[in-house]
Amino acid sequence: MSYNYVVTAQKPTAVNACVTGHFTSEDDLNLLIAKNTRLEIYVVTPEGLRPVKEVGMYGKIAVMELFRPKGESKDLLFILTAKYNACILEYKQSGDSIDIITRAHGNVQDRIGRPSETGIIGIIDPDCRMIGLRLYDGLFKVIPLERDNKELKAFNIRLEELHVIDVKFLYSCQAPTICFVYQDPQGRHVKTYEVSLREKEFSKGPWKQENVEAEASMVIAVPEPFGGAIIIGQESITYHNGDKYLAIAPPIIKQSTIVCHNRVDVNGSRYLLGDMEGRLFMLLLEKEEQMDGSVTLKDLRVELLGETSIAECLTYLDNGVVFVGSRLGDSQLVKLTTESNEQGSYVVVMETFTNLGPIVDMCVVDLERQGQGQLVTCSGAFKEGSLRIIRNGIGIHEHASIDLPGIKGLWPLRVAADRDTDDTLVLSFVGQTRVLTLTGEEVEETDLAGFVDDQQTFFCGNVAHQQLIQITSASVRLVSQNPQNLVSEWKEPQGRKVSVCSCNSRQVLLAVGRVLYYLEIHPGELRQTSCTEMEHEVACLDVTPLGGNDTLSSLCAIGLWTDISARILSLPGFQLLHKEMLGGEIIPRSILMTSFESSHYLLCALGDGALFYFSLNTDTGLLSDRKKVTLGTQPTVLRTFRSLSTTNVFACSDRPTVIYSSNHKLVFSNVNLKEVNYMCPLNSEGYPDSLALANNSTLTIGTIDEIQKLHIRTVPLFESPRKICYQEVSQCFGVLSSRIEVQDASGGSSPLRPSASTQALSSSVSCSKLFSGSTSPHETSFGEEVEVHNLLIIDQHTFEVLHTHQFLQNEYTLSLVSCKLGKDPTTYFVVGTAMVYPDEAEPKQGRIVVFQYNDGKLQTVAEKEVKGAVYSMVEFNGKLLASINSTVRLYEWTAEKELRTECNHYNNIMALYLKTKGDFILVGDLMRSVLLLAYKPMEGNFEEIARDFNPNWMSAVEILDDDNFLGAENAFNLFVCQKDSAATTDEERQHLQEVGLFHLGEFVNVFCHGSLVMQNLGETSPPTQGSVLFGTVNGMIGLVTSLSESWYNLLLDVQNRLNKVIKSVGKIEHSFWRSFHTERKTEPATGFIDGDLIESFLDISRPKMQEVIANLQIDDGSGMKRETTVDDLIKVVEELTRIH
């Protein structure tokens, strides 16, 4: 068997449907967005979109419609999934808890029936009498909407028009009436039928129209007063209602195909239309009032409003604001203006929502050399094409920086009385202190009355009773704010120097060697309340009040030298409440008591970058739940700051980290800065909600990203990226991309828009010795679009396009690798191509081109003609392995810098994917699943070891380990095949056994080994081995990792228990959702644990957790079993969440 854990690192981001209505209450205007399996619910507010809830569906959302049956005060939601689960959902809120109730559900799949090529269509009668579904050719399925029906029952009506393009219910008809566009051998036609619920039959509709435009593809039902329907084609827009027929053919819509529409007004007088190029149009219906008071349509008009992301769906919200949902680029919130701008556009982008989809290719690189992978993806398509750099961590955006070496501490001050923003920054150096005044964004050095500037400051801040405090090694100085002068000074009775200190607004804690002093701050006075001597020297201490800023802390935390301990003492009496031996020889350097999400913690950082953290009981001072993580390699300084009204901790070190709490568990997110020695929060007029950070040489002021797990940076290319690879020696990426050009009258072609390949710093064009002249006997005609393919060389730091190389006419780039070949020390970029002509079923010729990039120049070193398309290439033991149509071929690199064929393997339909490990080669075929080859170096040939005999249409493959091979196929499933080395017969050995099956519900385009997280974070490492990331069409990033059998069995047990406790939205069974499903077969999932379900354990209430673990046995580490506690399982699941 093979045991794997699959989990989401980034949820899908591509929007495939959006609707607006009153779902959460009758007064709220809601926007609902479907992102494959996820449903996001927002309320539209004057400030923008406010997220209300996100729901994970056990299915791919195929249809999503709001409707309001009679007797309901707010809208209900109808959802149909790709596996034909239908449900009607209602929003229920009681207090803080939000529930999505399933009012009715059912599965509407037919045992037989051919799924329609134009996909699933779901529509609801405007009078809410029925739901209509077109799932299969020749059938129209009806779900009657009866009020108290808990089960959705459906019946089919035969539809003699087999090929339906689009269908809608018409408004205000006595009986429910459908209007549809269909195709037959004569062309496309429009027809209407009435649906009879009693007879379960169609009867003749009110009107029909034969021979509409050949490309007619969309029906829009128009409400009263007009009624009827609008038919949208490639070149024309027509209106019908039985008596009236009106057609227009505006040239403006011909350039591209309209793909989505949305009604603006309730009376249907304006519609938004979006096309494949991202243009947004307004369709206006002009009315004419008749003598008898009725309204008829006078004219149709189309106006171009401007450009948006390429829209998959549009929805008009309110006040001229439109949500543009995109699958190929970022989604947007745009405002329509009454006046156009200089470019003639009426569209203003208000907000952008990141979308990584479609992820076509990706690679993992450690650019910052911090031992952490970053994922660089080829995302989007056409004008939305981009590279996305995805890092696990938090970004700091620099707003100002000053060269100031040697900073030893920094603190914000509000010097002027009664200010609520900081106006001063105090910086401490060895032997001196400097004060910077902040006015707006200007910074200048000043002096502060009552402060000393010839000593190093240990702490400085605003304290109670409108006073400031400065603590140096010599004394504690209390300064009044108004007038500003020294009012009290405390010195150590024997005149010894203060070694460490901590201070809040009313208390001061100081250590002088082993002696602790406790002072309280009063108006104009520092009062020493108590002192005590510890058995060792004090290394660090903290007196942060956990009740809030103005309260007294009844506890203090101390870290000691010599015995390496952390202690909790009471104040003011210094009674020892808890002593925790940290072990080892590294002293604690920073200690901090803090609260996250109303849970109290003690954090203690050591001099080697390790951090211990404990739960702290503030009543007893006891520590529990000891855990340890490694944050860096140098001493760490802990400081709290607030961001978006939550408390976070910044750990300053060589690997700066933000510590925050999510769902009551601590998350450690690294920050995109090389090194931070000291930091403090800063909230001044010129720099609101900022952080001041110091490293060895510089002071930086910046703002911090939203505290979240993944940080995404976008590099727009404005053309389609296809493949990416990284070349360390030249510190750049190679990217294959294609742009669209339009054929002009002279036979040449010109780009549609500026993009990465037309704006590079330098460029070159292929001229092949192999294909002389234009190889194109296939002429393209004037105005036709052609694809132009390029290799882009992109700088790894600035992401600037340094060079672009344009390939031949009709030459498509398919594969790319950066590698060294043979004994040649040079690292090359190698590109595989195909000559693509419209009249050839598959390419008959292509090239492998070897490039060298050096000092800003790209040279063609070698090219090799091949008889087919070079679908995939990998470096293989110093040679080049390529798959060309159905052949797998190995090339060696000669001393003359030429590619020479060494051996071939021919037994494939179309070899699309190659992965290698040692001498083994995994081949992914178009339709014949996967095949394992071994290269025999002595004989110089390939041997076929084993293959999977199941017909899987592959989309990506990866080698997990020597015996296990991972595949993704085109029905959104994952599977694992295993090599059976122990089999007794040759025949059994030649079969790869399918030992893992899982329905992912995502189309995987690429697998690659690598991880997004720092390795070795926890003390107990998670029970997983290896890490394979994958990227999907919907922009999801997932991870597959392997488990031991005992861990698999434990998690499988937990998974089954969770399924009993967690109720799914729409009442879809988890086992049904995850079962491996193709047109040929459905089999239960096996060999995979659903990590998303396991992680949801952390989000359920404690009583529910208790229910899950009842009588669950866990291994105590010595091979003995014992009953699991809730905290045991929380710890296990938390460890698992840290792998992504």
Curated annotation (Swiss-Prot):
Pathway: Protein modification; protein ubiquitination
Signal peptide annotation: none
Region (WD repeat beta-propeller A): 13-356
Cell compartment(s), UniProt: Cytoplasm; Nucleus
A Pfam family annotated for this UniProt entry: Beta-prop_RSE1_2nd
Region (WD repeat beta-propeller B) location: 391-708
A GO cellular component annotation in the UniProt record: cytoplasm
Entry GO MF terms: DNA binding
GO biological process: DNA repair; proteasome-mediated ubiquitin-dependent protein catabolic process; protein ubiquitination; regulation of circadian rhythm; rhythmic process
Chain spans, region WD repeat beta-propeller C: 709-1043
Job description of the protein: Protein, which is both involved in DNA repair and protein ubiquitination, as part of the UV-DDB complex and DCX (DDB1-CUL4-X-box) complexes, respectively. Core component of the UV-DDB complex (UV-damaged DNA-binding protein complex), a complex that recognizes UV-induced DNA damage and recruit proteins of the nucleotide excision repair pathway (the NER pathway) to initiate DNA repair. The UV-DDB complex may recognize UV-induced DNA damage and recruit proteins of the nucleotide excision repair pathway (the NER pathway) to initiate DNA repair.
Subunit record text: Component of the UV-DDB complex which includes ddb1 and ddb2. Component of numerous DCX (DDB1-CUL4-X-box) E3 ubiquitin-protein ligase complexes which consist of a core of ddb1, cul4a or cul4b and rbx1, and a substrate receptor, such as CRBN. DDB1 may recruit specific substrate targeting subunits to the DCX complex. These substrate targeting subunits are generally known as DCAF (DDB1- and CUL4-associated factor) or CDW (CUL4-DDB1-associated WD40-repeat) proteins.
Free-text note on domains in this protein's UniProt record: The core of the protein consists of three WD40 beta-propeller domains.
Family of this protein: Belongs to the DDB1 family.
Protein name per its UniProtKB record: DNA damage-binding protein 1
